[in-house]
């Protein structure tokens, strides 16, 4: 019914630690560039535009090396500090070339290719087709012998009970409407397990792009394979849904892992060097003298123009602004592609007379779109290999051993992050609320589509229009909620509560159908098909606000410097929660033999997060997060010292403490817990 939640980058607002005021410095762009050496990197899997510039880069490296020979030891030390401020590490095969427009286009193209699967397939035509295929193999519930009719066939009295169907799957009798719900639960479970297992490969080694393309091809071809699904092999449709949904989720995790790298190496960031206190103490006089010498340079040579060095706070602001700009553009491009494909899908369904064949043709088109427009992404997106695992000796063996090493490391990192999160009460409150809320969001979408198909007898083209309306309203909501919150003076958690109140209207509206006087009216309470359209607009508008503000609120609670690990936990909570809602709704449908009672469950699921959000104290969460960050930073300082000594920190460093956001042992964790509780 609605597209995937837009994943705007976090914009946490924190009070900066008191620092000694920094004095703006001027420096020559040429002098700054001479200190940067861009390592030549080659791979059989790299983008086509990477080798074309190798000669010019080699020449640049040569010039850079000669300039580096004349730089002072303090300048080299400052360069290392600079690189750490960007979040980067020095390691073998690091690709530090500036982000190109072609590389950005490749990143956008994958969103353009794959977002259509969310909007047109998994949120619309796949659940419709799965229910239709199950119905073709089912029998009427009333006698368990008569074959079922199409769910959108109108009965003379307009009743719903006579058209309820059941189908036998693996020896179990289930309602045809719950068949799709159980399928989605299985797919989300596998997706959550896979996302955790590959998260390490997304950040380490040279597997990021290879895995992204592998999952893209698997997902797109599994969607195209729906053209071969027929009544006799309807279970194949469920298997393809599981494969495609799991592949899509994994590919988008890998795509999102490119975003920090694109931002970090963007020219706007590369040439915005942070100022440090040490630089001012030891280099201010020399730097100003060098900068002043360029005032006499040719006034027509822009390359020698002077530029103010940014403070660390300013550099962070630039990075967040650029990250938001790139991510928002990718979301917008994906939404536009999804709406365009959905309009074509409606035309196909109209042309082919609302048959299951028309739905299979639509899915063939969606899969082909995903596959074809992944090709430019494969050509233009650079591999950008990450640092090796701290246990590098294990991962370097390759093959199955490397896979096991990466998977075990990923699960260890997850458990370590959870051990940190449970010590922060406001993080726990938020993740509990987000677990319930994200489950309600996903379950409401699939339940509403199936209710409209089986209870309201809406035809496939009308069901597709529900998705179009919801997506359009979601785009409007993403931009409107910021204005609404400013206008009403709402804080982020208050805006989330306002969204929850509006969201609660959807299941409550469905429950109105139980009221006797509403039943007598024959309208309202989801008794007429047209009522789905305004509800779809409300759903999309609410989703546009929740997606952004939940990430923003969570960002304010994260310990400074641990954003990546905690946002991974945020994503896993989002994926993992969606296992339960569809399964419970499926059980309700099987027990009651209709879908409307599921609105009771949805009303509870939507309302439960509200008190948890209400009791979140952002100020308290910031203080506790900063105290925890101080302990984490102690281990990171040890890692930096190991790096300066020319060795990569490993799990064996520091008395066996493994890396954990930085790593900590049990004694550190107990000390932190006492600090937080003793505030």
Swiss-Prot record:
UniProt entry tagged with the keyword Membrane: yes
Biased composition (Basic and acidic residues): 50-60, 638-650
Region entry Disordered, spans: 1-98, 638-679
Keyword Transmembrane: yes
GO CC aspect terms: vacuolar membrane
Subcellular location as annotated: Vacuole membrane
TM region positions: 110-130, 178-198, 211-229, 233-255, 330-350, 361-381, 398-420, 424-444, 464-484, 496-516, 530-550, 569-589, 598-618
SUPFAM superfamilies documented for this protein: MFS general substrate transporter (SSF103473)
Membrane topology: Multi-pass membrane protein
Major localization class: membrane
Protein name, UniProt field: Autophagy-related protein 22
